[in-house]
Amino acid sequence: MRNNHSLRLQLWFRTLFTVGVVTLLMIDAFVLQNNKEDDKTKEITTAVNMNNSDAKEIQQELEDGSRNDDLSYVASKRKVPRGPDPIHNRFLLLSRFILSLLTNPYPYLHICVLDVSV
């Protein structure tokens, strides 16, 4: 009888724990969803509150920067290195290595013959 009671108690605690974890996950999901909606609301409010003259000034600055070859824009561009590309050349090196193994199965094994004269 006591064994049956302890099994019921364990089942009760497991169920309570599972319901608690699921509840916490649901609360977390709702909080994250509300935070995203609040961020969108702030962005829309900021865009609405910005004066039309401010928008024109920003547009003018963007146009001036592109016409005058703004150095900050040029400096922020990613530099691409010149020369061989090691990422794409790795397959070429691998195929050369396999080809060398096919032609000479023991490329690193050197046979040394010693001339021993007595």
UniProtKB/Swiss-Prot annotation:
The modification Hydroxyproline is found at P81, P84. InterPro entries: CLE25/26. The keyword rRNA processing does not apply. Residues 1-29 form the signal peptide. One of its GO terms (biological process) is cell-cell signaling involved in cell fate commitment. Keywords: Developmental protein, Differentiation, Glycoprotein, Hydroxylation, Secreted, Signal. GO terms for cellular component: apoplast. One of its GO terms (molecular function) is receptor serine/threonine kinase binding. Glycans are attached at N51, P84. It comes from the Eukaryota. PANTHER family: CLAVATA3/ESR (CLE)-RELATED PROTEIN 26, CLAVATA3_ESR (CLE)-RELATED PROTEIN 26. Belongs to the CLV3/ESR signal peptide family. This is CLAVATA3/ESR (CLE)-related protein 26.
